[in-house]
Amino acid sequence: MAGKLDISVVVPLYNESESLPELMAWIDRVCTAEKFAYEVIMVDDGSNDGSWGVIEQLKGVYGEKLKAIHFMRNYGKSAALYCGFEAAVGEVVFTMDADLQDSPDEIPAMRRMVIEEGYDLVSGWKRKRYDPLGKRLPSKFFNWTARTVSGIKLNDFNCGLKCYRKSVVKSIEVYGEMHRYIPILAKYAGFKRIGEKEVHHQARKYGVSKFGMERMIKGYLDLISVTFMSHFGRSPMYFFGSLGTLMFILGGFTTCWIIGSKIYKQVNDLPLRAVADQPLFYLAILAIILGVQLFLAGFLGELINRNSSDRNRYLTDKRL
């Protein structure tokens, strides 16, 4: 597509064949009305319901306005977003789910917040949700935890509708279930201006939700991971080495105290107790062993961090 693009819209999808024509038409209608030069990047995460065939038909209608990537198998939403971000060239990059629950009508206002108000990232907030209670309650608890841990005052971290300055998506790496924590990744990458806009949420029109307890558990594990990696990911030795050294010193000091105490009692003819009969002795030895192991863990982490290949390698067999 010739010329500079105002907007890239990245749409990760899995088995959403019914909603794709309506979504593409909606995005086109909004962007055409606002005279935005735009592209839509649909990333098919290994769908088995004919979604790719629908995308091929849409490509014939919309031409260069539509790009598409097809994964050979299902890798997850983070993988789809990562590949979409790599392909995006628009000045502002949007993400939205393919299930029609995110409204493209929000695009102009969210873009203005980035372009005119200077935000690096604007996240949607679905204040009034049309999801089942079993999805809303865990989501509320998750958002509270993420807010507390990160210090970012967002009400809806997991909203699929987000707007980014292009430099943000080109500076972060998402994998696992990290798509939930892109605002946290952006903050730790140095992008401090993170805003929120209340958006209209719609009930799912086609298909069924892919939400499940397994995803919730993985999300919490990734929250721990992203917090740790943001602080120590570049140098694991800072964490493991420091903790290991502290444990080793504590164990060594305790051992010296036990030995010194025994010598003192021998010199002064005081009652002695066998070192092996003292629980403190075993705690000291345990601390020394743990200290050495933690130090070695930090060293191995450094080696892996310095020599690891790119973790985001996904097999794609089709591109449009």
Give the predicted meaning of each segment.
Residues 44-53, 100-101:
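A conserved acidic beta->alpha catalytic loop
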Residues 18-22, 49-58:
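Acidic helix N-cap motif at the loop->helix transition within catalytic regions
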Residues 2-3, 184-320:
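Hydrophobic helical membrane-anchoring modules
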Residues 16-19, 47, 77, 103:
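Donor nucleotide-sugar binding loop of glycosyltransferases
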Residues 24, 36-47, 69-70:
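Short beta-strand/loop segment that forms part of the nucleotide-sugar
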Residues 1-29, 36:
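N-proximal low-complexity "stem/linker" segments adjacent to membrane-targeting elements
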Residues 57, 69-73, 77-87, 92, ...:
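Acceptor/aglycone-binding surface of glycosyltransferases and processive sugar-polymer synthases
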